[in-house]
């Protein structure tokens, strides 16, 4: 009997289930998971939680985690995965766009692996949720800029924002944007990844944005660095 496929994803002793309409964690989320230093007293915000990957991993250490997502199916999936992994009592799942569901709240740590694939202007095929999940606007910064703009009002003194960023969006640009938001920035981690398949059909646009020449070609294959950028409140 036909039905929607269920995907299982295992990471560091945690189990994540997702139906076909919710994406499993990809390289950026895994990179961020390896570099998020969560403290026992932390109250954490997971922006765009998806299957709940980052929030659930953080909840194993943190005092409390709030996870938001604009997609109802993702919120329900993440809530189910929190129960599956025994951390539901430490988590609060909220439906809404980025910070909208946490108005007036502040956090010790904010985690984000947002859409950041540059999308050519005039694209009219973004009804596919899989494409929307990667849509960073014409420069790749559409969602990242919103996260940085509003981060200061949601960070406690000394609080940290950790977000992923393709190097072709600009390493210096990323740090300058963090500073412009009134935060102190640094590169937490970096890793070389095969060039994303979704980026190949928009390669000319991406190459035009790569002011720092970060895209590499080795043995006929393209590679790009993925960064974890830190931003700390005063």
Identify the function of each model-found stretch.
Residues 99-110:
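A short acidic, Gly/Pro-enriched loop at the edge of an enzyme's catalytic core
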């Amino acid at each position: 009997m036909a039905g929607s496929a269920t995907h299982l994803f295992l990471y560091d002793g945690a189990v994540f289930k997702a139906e076909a309409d919710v994406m499993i964690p990809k390289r950026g989320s895994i990179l961020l998971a390896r570099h998020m230093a969560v403290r026992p007293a932390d109250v954490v915000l997971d922006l765009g939680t998806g299957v709940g990957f980052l929030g659930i991993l953080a909840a194993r250490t943190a005092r409390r985690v709030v996870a938001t997502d604009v997609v109802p199916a993702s919120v329900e999936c993440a809530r189910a995965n929190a129960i599956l992994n025994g951390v539901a009592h430490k988590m609060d799942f909220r439906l809404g766009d980025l910070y909208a569901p946490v108005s007036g709240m502040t956090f010790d740590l904010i985690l984000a692996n947002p859409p950041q694939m540059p999308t050519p202007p005039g694209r009219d095929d973004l009804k596919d949720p899989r494409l929307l999940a990667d849509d960073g606007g014409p420069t790749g910064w559409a969602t990242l800029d919103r996260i940085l703009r509003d981060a200061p009002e949601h960070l406690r003194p000394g609080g940290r924002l950790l977000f992923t960023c393709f190097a072709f969006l600009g390493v210096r640009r990323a740090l300058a944007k963090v500073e412009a938001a009134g935060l102190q920035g640094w590169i937490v981690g970096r890793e070389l990844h095969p060039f994303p398949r979704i980026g190949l059909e928009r390669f000319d646009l991406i190459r035009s944005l790569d002011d720092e020449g970060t895209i590499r070609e080795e043995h006929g294959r393209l590679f790009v660095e993925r960064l974890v950028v830190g931003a700390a409140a005063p």
